[in-house]
From Swiss-Prot:
Keyword Oxidoreductase annotated: yes
Family that this chain belongs to: Belongs to the RuBisCO large chain family. Type I subfamily.
A single Gene Ontology CC term: chloroplast
Enzyme class at the top of the EC tree: lyase
Presence of the UniProt keyword Ribonucleoprotein in the record: no
Name under which the protein is recorded: Ribulose bisphosphate carboxylase large chain
Catalytic activity entry: 2 (2R)-3-phosphoglycerate + 2 H(+) = D-ribulose 1,5-bisphosphate + CO2 + H2O; D-ribulose 1,5-bisphosphate + O2 = 2-phosphoglycolate + (2R)-3-phosphoglycerate + 2 H(+)
Subunit details: Heterohexadecamer of 8 large chains and 8 small chains; disulfide-linked. The disulfide link is formed within the large subunit homodimers.
Cofactor: Mg(2+)
Length: 469
């Protein structure tokens, strides 16, 4: 027997399988300021105690495996293991629990969302002892946040670049999303920007397809926004989608956008991946480009209520990885509770500090120290009648994006943009005068439509679609 084997035997190593809770359930643990804290919604299999389920999550997402191993003795598990330190039942749900897990910071590579997620939302989500598992929230410690660049520029720098203050920004996704030639696509961009919007957007599906290669689209869109800028005297932007099949092609597109002198590019951060997104965000800061983020594929991850990951976690991850805008949903037409939840993660995107507030879905107090904020983008099924609600709900630091609500105007693209800009300016002026947008919203829009025929036509075409506060 070798000396090493004798040493291990003498300290009582015993092969076999033991309950996770014996090692990883530690209700007496006091969390550290440097710990990453996670709140998991755990649905154990029948017969599995919640303490064992919570401990299994902590183990399988940190140092644990299914059996005792010799090499446990070659490191300090107390230093590196995750710990399930608190469990509470979910009100109104049978056999569901919120399990709180603390992870030592040394488990994670600095500045890598990819590595953080590989551990925390990795193989543990397929663990047989659990019927379902959902990551509801994360507390990112300041010590870890400071290893990330974060958003390339942030809200204030973007406003300074665009010279636009005191109101939400207006955007429009060009439709149809697929099938237009580059020249016709550029024409639509020009008409909408000339009509008064601040931004137009590539649809997330638009990369470099046979009907419209990326370089042609970039050239025609750049020509369109420069022409619109010259006519309106305002700085304009088009979200040029740099998402590609390889990081090399993505960077090639970002470099060409910079050479054209446009102000902003775009990335699909979930389908493109966090490594690609962080790479692009670093390039954007170094080269003065704003970065618009689309969340295509998010519903695959966050739609189920008891499995996957809540979007607030994806939003926090984006703020670490880097982006100046991100789509956040519209809130319009949602139930009141859902509105509070949505505005909870909107505040997590924008604010420097957010207090714990379970009614808004915020499980942990979160400080972002000097990390710039991200503008939430409200888009999807909105039109001029929604403008008072959107202005009231999202405030100035947001992007309100009307696709069909611009391009569906009966008189064409430019009048559709005019209608949205007039509606927004009317709502902002009314708010600044102290009027209540929640109660007087429809009246404000009707008053503005009396001197704007474009807005009057938009009001008529969408009058049957109502928003209820």
């Amino acid at each position: 027997m070798s000396p090493q084997t004798e040493t291990k035997a003498s300290v009582g190593f015993k092969a076999g399988v033991k309950d996770y809770k014996l090692t990883y359930y530690t209700p007496e643990y006091e969390t550290l300021d440097t710990d990453i804290l996670a709140a998991f919604r755990v649905s154990p299999q029948p017969g599995v105690p919640p303490e064992e389920a919570g401990a299994a999550v902590a183990a399988e997402s940190s140092t644990g495996t299914w059996t005792t191993v010799w090499t446990d003795g070659l490191t300090s598990l107390d230093r590196y293991k995750g710990r399930c330190y608190h469990i509470e039942p979910v009100a109104g749900e049978e056999n569901q629990y919120i399990c709180y897990v603390a992870y030592p910071l040394d488990l994670f590579e600095e500045g890598s969302v990819t590595n953080m997620f590989t551990s925390i939302v990795g193989n543990v989500f397929g663990f047989k002892a659990l019927r379902a598992l959902r990551l509801e929230d994360l507390r990112i410690p300041v010590a870890y946040i400071k290893t990330f660049q974060g958003p390339p520029h942030g809200i204030q720098v973007e406003r300074d670049k665009l010279n636009k203050y005191g109101r939400p920004l207006l955007g429009c996704t060009i439709k149809p999303k697929l099938g237009l030639s580059a020249k016709n696509y550029g024409r639509a961009v020009y008409e909408v920007l000339r009509g008064g919007l601040d931004f137009t957007k590539d649809d997330e599906n638009v990369n470099s397809q046979p009907f419209m290669r990326w370089r042609d689209r970039f050239l025609f869109c750049a020509e369109a926004l420069y022409k619109a800028q010259a006519e309106t005297g305002e700085i304009k932007g088009h979200y040029l989608n740099a998402t590609a099949g390889t990081c090399e092609d993505m960077m090639k597109r970002a470099v060409f956008a910079r050479e054209l002198g446009v102000p902003i590019v775009m990335h699909d951060y979930l389908t493109g991946g966090f490594t690609a997104n962080t790479t692009l965000a670093h390039y954007c800061r170094d080269n003065g480009l704003l970065l618009h983020i689309h969340r295509a594929m998010h519903a695959v991850i966050d739609r189920q209520k008891n499995h996957g990951m809540h979007f607030r976690v994806l939003a926090k991850a984006l703020r670490l990885s880097g982006g100046d805008h991100i789509h956040s949903g519209t809130v319009v037409g949602k139930l009141e509770g859902e509105r509070d939840i949505t505005l909870g993660f909107v505040d997590l995107l924008r604010d420097d500090y957010t207090e714990k507030d379970r009614s808004r879905g915020i499980y942990f107090t979160q400080s972002w120290v000097s990390t710039p904020g991200v503008l939430p983008v409200a888009s999807g099924g909105i039109h001029v009648w929604h403008m008072p609600a959107l202005t009231e709900i999202f405030g100035d630091d947001s992007v309100l994006q009307f696709g069909g609500g611009t391009l569906g105007h009966p008189w064409g693209n430019a009048p559709g943009a005019v209608a949205n800009r007039v509606a927004l300016e009317a709502c902002v002026q009314a708010r600044n005068e102290g009027r209540d947008l929640a109660r007087e919203g429809n009246t404000i829009i009707r008053e503005a439509s009396k001197w704007s025929p474009e807005l009057a036509a938009a009001c008529e075409i969408w009058k049957e679609i109502k928003f209820e506060f």
